[in-house]
C-alpha cells in the first residue's frame, strides 16, 4: 500500500473509501492500486 497526500483512482475498478478518518483506494482487480491518504 502506498501513502500519498492526494489519492486518485488509477482504473475504473478503484473505489475511494473512508475508514477511521483516513481515505483509502481499494481495487479488487489490481491490488497494487491500493493507496492511503495521510
Curated annotation (Swiss-Prot):
Which keywords does this chain's UniProt record carry? Ribonucleoprotein, Ribosomal protein
Q: Which Pfam families is this protein grouped with?
A: Ribosomal_L36 (PF00444)
GO cellular component terms, alphabetically, are: ribonucleoprotein complex; ribosome
Question: Which PROSITE patterns has this protein been placed in?
Answer: RIBOSOMAL_L36
User: Which InterPro entries does the UniProt record give?
Assistant: Ribosomal_bL36 (IPR000473), Ribosomal_bL36_sp (IPR035977), Ribosomal_LSU_bL36 (IPR052010)
Chaperone as a keyword?
no
Give GO terms: molecular function aspect only. Answer: structural constituent of ribosome
Picking any one GO biological process from the record gives: translation
Keyword Nuclease on this protein? no
Q: Which PANTHER family match?
A: RIBOSOMAL PROTEIN (PTHR18804:SF16)
Q: Into which family does the record put it?
A: Belongs to the bacterial ribosomal protein bL36 family.
Return the HAMAP family for the record.
Answer: Ribosomal_bL36
This protein is called Large ribosomal subunit protein bL36
Say which species the protein is native to.
Pelodictyon phaeoclathratiforme (strain DSM 5477 / BU-1)
Amino acid at each position: 500500500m502506498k501513502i500519498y497526500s492526494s489519492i486518485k483512482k488509477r482504473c475504473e475498478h478503484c473505489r475511494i473509501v473512508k475508514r477511521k478518518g483516513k481515505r483509502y483506494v481499494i481495487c479488487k482487480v489490481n491490488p497494487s492500486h491500493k493507496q492511503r491518504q495521510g
